[in-house]
């Protein structure tokens, strides 16, 4: 809970938040969980990219525009992230949390690239200046554990989300 509060304190200094499906999931979840309002402009790339002809989830769109997450993160998605988190909670295996942080960092880095792509598509339509893409950084820390990820993909049952009954 401490880190989540730090996150809310951190984002309140920004006037715009860029997300993928955040207007439907992340922001409402945070507002309900913390009984607060996140009062800043939001750019939800899910809908912006849909208007430009890109559909599907974040990983599909990344693939469609040629963004690679690397071999170690092949097939890793939101469900895998939940498995990694549950595995970490159960085992305290640092490689699980490193893999999860690596996954989330890639989400964040690729959102910047997709925002630039969307902006440039609109800039071309309106014949205005486009943005230069920054070179995508290489993440040196938080290395993913490919063996653990493969294990969780093959044996998800123990670490799958529990249904609320």
Task: Name each model-derived stretch.
Residues 1-165:
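DEDD superfamily 3′-5′ metal-dependent exonuclease/proofreading module
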């Amino acid at each position: 809970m401490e880190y989540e509060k730090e996150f809310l304190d951190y984002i309140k200094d920004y006037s715009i938040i860029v997300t993928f499906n955040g207007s439907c999931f992340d922001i409402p979840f945070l507002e309900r969980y913390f009984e607060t309002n996140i009062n800043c402009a939001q750019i939800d790339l899910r809908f912006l990219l849909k208007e430009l002809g890109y559909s599907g989830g974040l990983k599909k769109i990344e693939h469609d525009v040629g963004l690679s997450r690397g071999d170690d993160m092949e097939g890793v998605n939101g469900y895998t992230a939940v498995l990694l988190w549950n595995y970490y909670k159960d085992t305290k295996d640092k490689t699980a949390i490193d893999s999860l942080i690596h996954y989330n960092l890639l989400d964040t880095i690729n959102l910047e690239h997709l925002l630039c792509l969307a902006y440039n598509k609109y800039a071309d339509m309106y014949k205005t200046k486009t943005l230069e893409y920054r070179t995508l950084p290489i993440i040196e820390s938080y290395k993913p554990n490919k063996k653990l990820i493969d294990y969780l993909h093959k044996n998800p049952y123990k670490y799958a989300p529990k249904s609320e009954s």
